[in-house]
Amino acid sequence: MNHLPMPTFGPLAGVRVVFSGIEIAGPFAGQMFAEWGAEVIWIENVAWADTIRVQPNYPQLSRRNLHALSLNIFKDEGREAFLKLMETTDIFIEASKGPAFARRGITDEVLWEHNPKLVIAHLSGFGQYGTEEYTNLPAYNTIAQAFSGYLIQNGDVDQPMPAFPYTADYFSGMTATTAALAALHKVRETGKGESIDIAMYEVMLRMGQYFMMDYFNGGEICPRMTKGKDPYYAGCGLYKCADGYIVMELVGITQINECFKDIGLAHILGTPEVPEGTQLIHRVECPYGPLVEEKLDAWLATHTIAEVQARFAELNIACAKVLTIPELEGNPQYVARESITQWQTMDGRTCKGPNIMPKFKNNPGKIWRGMPSHGMDTAAILKNIGYSEADIKELVGKGLAKVED
């Protein structure tokens, strides 16, 4: 396989990934591959570009490092070109409503006829099979959260609330990335392709697993938070200091002992309710739970965030200031690790946003390109798989492909 022009870097150099999907979930999977060195081709509709392009800034992050192919993959010669592309592809990711590709004639079996080693990742709201009532329904972040039991666990005691921004999309996209890599590892061992069925609601079901297990194995429903505080454990969650908010986790024998001395509760240590060796204070089951919250709230309210952080660092209590967005890039940890970076857009502007993550020591990822324009790489990609300029012109003339203006 001849690769498209791009630098060689990262742990996935030499891997070709193609994805078809709009907005966040499917493209996020492709984005991770692109930042780790894979050659990633982004398929867009010929007539209508990905709707994410209407956003002013986010696409410059979510579509960086990609090659843009505008092709009608379901019709006539456009379908033929897509299947030819699949012959040189390692991983194909599609995000749609249920078995949309199969309904339009592009089944796993058709793809494997062209490439028996192909890894195929199907990402949808409700999966590739199940009941007709659900399988073909559209789904977005909030739909997956609501259907999975994840949303009902979030928010305040008085009202559930979705976790934002777009949590289900990102969890599902990352699941597609990791699952496809696992499949690719096996394919290179066996030579046999794989098809992965990723249902967004099942991803969120698994992500919401912690307290669900108490219901499935005993019928206990975990209450939601009250003003950001852990529903079960005192000293855990969101708290207000004299000048802003922190989060903290009061966990550990020494941590509880020393903290209680500071807030005036040393006298309850070693009691039947708080015996020696206590590592967590249950908010409900421990009679002193409400008192712990009362004393902790009062102590924190009289101290600044900096004072609390300094003292908790001495006591080895996990704690962090709730940073505002403007505070991020000036934070010394962000600066030291270059967590926020800059890159050039295709039209020469400077864009600022999150850097590559995670950080590979020996084969680091990199940002080598901004978001390509609609159809920008169509001609180069088609030439790469054997199409002549005349062939490409014919596809464009039939409305089956779009090249850069």
UniProtKB/Swiss-Prot annotation:
Alphabetical keyword list: Cytoplasm, Transferase
Coiled coil (residue ranges): none
Pfam families: CoA_transf_3
Recorded metabolic or biological pathway in which this protein acts: Amine and polyamine metabolism; carnitine metabolism
Entry's Gene Ontology cellular component terms: cytoplasm
Domain of life where this protein originates: Bacteria
Residues that hold CoA according to the record: K97, R104
EC numbers for this chain: 2.8.3.21
Substrates-to-products reaction catalysed: crotonobetainyl-CoA + (R)-carnitine = crotonobetaine + (R)-carnitinyl-CoA; 4-(trimethylamino)butanoyl-CoA + (R)-carnitine = (R)-carnitinyl-CoA + 4-(trimethylamino)butanoate
InterPro entries according to UniProt: CoA-transferase_III, CoA-Trfase_CaiB, CoA-Trfase_fam_III, CoA-Trfase_III_dom3_sf, CoA-Trfase_III_dom_1_sf
Compartments where found: Cytoplasm
Entry's Gene Ontology molecular function annotations: L-carnitine CoA-transferase activity
Function: Catalyzes the reversible transfer of the CoA moiety from gamma-butyrobetainyl-CoA to L-carnitine to generate L-carnitinyl-CoA and gamma-butyrobetaine. Is also able to catalyze the reversible transfer of the CoA moiety from gamma-butyrobetainyl-CoA or L-carnitinyl-CoA to crotonobetaine to generate crotonobetainyl-CoA.
PANTHER family per the UniProt record, alphabetical: L-CARNITINE COA-TRANSFERASE, SUCCINYL-COA--D-CITRAMALATE COA-TRANSFERASE
Assembly with partners or alone: Homodimer.
Protein name: L-carnitine CoA-transferase
